[in-house]
């Protein structure tokens, strides 16, 4: 479900930072959306980080934006030029 109000990426980013989900209007029927993964701190206890840091090392996991894909998987997301300039971003509720 979405609000139907369209906006640019600057507003979309502010909505993401406020904890809301956003999508491009064309993605909506596919169940895709972006969301913020907040930063956290954890101790290394398994690969692949266990091959980089000694076990028990405290690591800072930085906040970032992930995408729920049409297949239901979660992937890191990076904006394209067309995403940055688009004016068809919408809030996703639920």
List each model region and its residues:
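Basic/polar N-terminal segments that are highly enriched at the extreme N-terminus
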Residues: 1-3, 94
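Catalytic phosphate/metal-binding cores of nucleic-acid and nucleotide-processing enzymes, i.e., regions
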Residues: 3-49, 67
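Intrinsically disordered, low-complexity, compositionally biased regions/tails
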Residues: 12-14, 43, 55, 60, ...
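A generic structural signal for short, solvent-exposed coil/turn residues
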Residues: 14-16, 26, 57-59, 81-83
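Short, low-complexity, polar/charged sequence segments that are solvent-exposed and flexible
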Residues: 41-44, 53-55, 83-87
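Aromatic- and Gly/Pro-rich amphipathic surface segment
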Residues: 46-66
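Short, compact, well-ordered microdomains
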Residues: 59-94
């Amino acid at each position: 479900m979405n609000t139907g109000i369209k906006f640019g990426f600057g507003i979309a980013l502010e909505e993401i930072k406020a904890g809301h989900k956003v999508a491009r209007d064309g993605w909506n029927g596919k169940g895709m959306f972006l969301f913020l993964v907040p930063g956290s701190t954890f101790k290394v206890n398994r690969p692949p980080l266990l091959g980089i840091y000694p076990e028990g090392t405290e690591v800072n996991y930085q906040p970032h934006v992930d995408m729920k894909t049409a297949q239901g998987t979660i992937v890191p997301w990076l904006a394209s030029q067309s995403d940055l300039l688009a004016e068809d971003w919408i809030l996703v509720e639920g």
